[in-house]
Regions:
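Catalytic cores of secreted or luminal carbohydrate-active enzymes
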Residues: 239-292
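Ligand-binding face of N-terminal immunoglobulin V-set domains in extracellular IgSF glycoproteins
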Residues: 114-142
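Bacterial Sec-dependent N-terminal signal peptides
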Residues: 1-24
Length: 292
C-alpha cells in the first residue's frame, strides 16, 4: 500500500530556519539562475498547494538571450521522494506529464547581464494534477537533451485533522535554547488500520528538511489517531533570527550591505559582517527565504 504523506510544518519566528527545501531543487546548468518555486503568491512558505487549489508557479532565468526549447517532465513521488512505482502518468496528470514546452518567456532589456526569464504554472492547459503527493519537475533542453534543473513541490488534500503546540518549556531546559513540539493527528476519515505502515509523518522547522524529524514514534495511539507529547525527537534547537539584507540600489548600500562595487562588467554587493548574537533578539524576518 502506498504511504500517504503527512507533513506537519512548524513555522515560528523563534525557530532557526533556512530555505532547506531547496536541497530538493537542483540546478545543473551554469546558465540557469534565480530558480523560484512558489505556491500561489506565498513566497514565504514552502511550495505546498492544495489539490484543485492554488497553482504552483515556477520561474527561472537563463543568463543568455539564446533561444532554448525548454520542456518539462512531471513525476509523482513517494513520501521519501523516490519516484512512485505502479502508477501511470494518467493516474496523476490530466493531459501531458512529459514533453510540454515552457512558452512564457521574457528577455531582459537594458541590463548589464543578458538573461531570459521563463515562467511556468501548474495546472496549465497541458497538465492538471489529479492526485495529491510529492512531485518532482525536471526541465531539460529538448534540442540538447540535457537536464538544466529539477524542482520539487507538494500537493495535499485536507483529509487528516492535525493540531500542535510549541513550547519553550522542554524536557531539556526552560525558556532557554530549545523548543518542543506536541502534535496530534486524527485520521478517522482515511480508514487507516495500520498507522505504522500507512502513515509517514514529518515535522520540520520552517521547512528545513535538513533537521526534519521523520516517523517519530508517538506516545499515544487511539483507534482514530496518534499523539506526541514530551517526545525527545520533537525537541529542536531554538537558534536565533536570521540577519537580513536587501539589495535595492546599485548606487549606494542598503540594509545589511557594506558596499556595492562595479568591476567593469557586473555590480558586486558585499554583505556587512555581523557579530553573533549571544541572546535571542526578535527581528521579523523571512526565515531564510528570498524574494527576487
Amino acid at each position: 500500500m502506498k504511504k500517504p504523506l503527512l507533513a506537519i510544518i512548524i513555522a515560528l519566528s523563534a525557530l532557526a530556519a533556512n530555505n532547506s527545501f531547496a536541497q530538493y531543487n537542483e540546478i545543473k546548468s551554469e546558465n540557469i539562475a534565480s530558480l523560484q518555486v512558489v505556491a500561489g503568491n506565498n513566497w514565504l512558505s514552502m511550495p505546498i498547494a492544495t489539490l484543485n487549489g492554488e497553482a504552483i508557479n515556477i520561474s527561472f532565468d537563463d543568463l543568455t538571450h539564446e533561444y532554448h526549447r525548454y520542456v518539462y517532465r512531471l513525476q509523482h513521488c513517494e513520501a521519501d521522494w523516490s519516484v512512485s512505482e505502479g502508477i501511470f502518468e494518467s493516474d496523476y496528470c490530466e493531459g501531458f506529464a512529459d514533453g510540454s514546452t515552457i512558452d512564457d518567456i521574457e528577455e531582459s532589456l537594458n541590463t548589464n547581464t543578458l538573461y531570459t526569464h521563463y515562467r511556468l504554472s501548474i495546472p496549465n492547459e497541458n497538465c492538471r494534477i489529479k492526485m495529491s503527493g510529492n512531485y518532482r519537475l525536471t526541465v531539460y533542453d529538448e534540442n540538447e537533451g540535457d537536464t538544466v534543473f529539477t524542482a520539487c513541490f507538494m500537493v495535499v488534500e485536507p483529509l487528516v485533522k492535525t493540531s500542535m503546540a510549541v513550547t519553550t518549556n522542554t524536557d531539556i531546559d526552560t525558556n532557554k535554547a530549545h523548543q518542543q513540539v506536541a502534535a496530534e493527528i486524527n485520521y478517522s476519515a482515511l480508514g487507516i488500520t495500520n498507522p505504522n505502515a500507512e502513515l509517514y509523518t514529518v515535522v520540520m522547522q520552517n521547512g528545513r528538511w535538513s533537521t526534519a524529524r521523520i516517523n517519530a514514534a508517538p506516545q499515544y495511539q487511539t483507534g482514530s489517531g496518534l499523539r506526541w507529547e514530551h517526545n525527545p525527537d520533537y525537541i529542536f534547537n531554538g537558534g536565533n533570527e536570521f540577519h537580513k539584507f536587501e539589495i535595492l540600489d546599485v548606487t549606494h548600500p542598503t540594509l545589511g550591505i557594506e558596499n556595492v562595487g562595479w568591476d567593469g562588467k557586473n555590480y558586486h554587493a558585499q554583505i556587512r559582517t555581523d557579530l553573533p548574537r549571544p541572546r535571542y533578539v526578535y527581528d521579523e524576518d523571512a526565515n531564510g527565504t528570498l524574494y527576487i
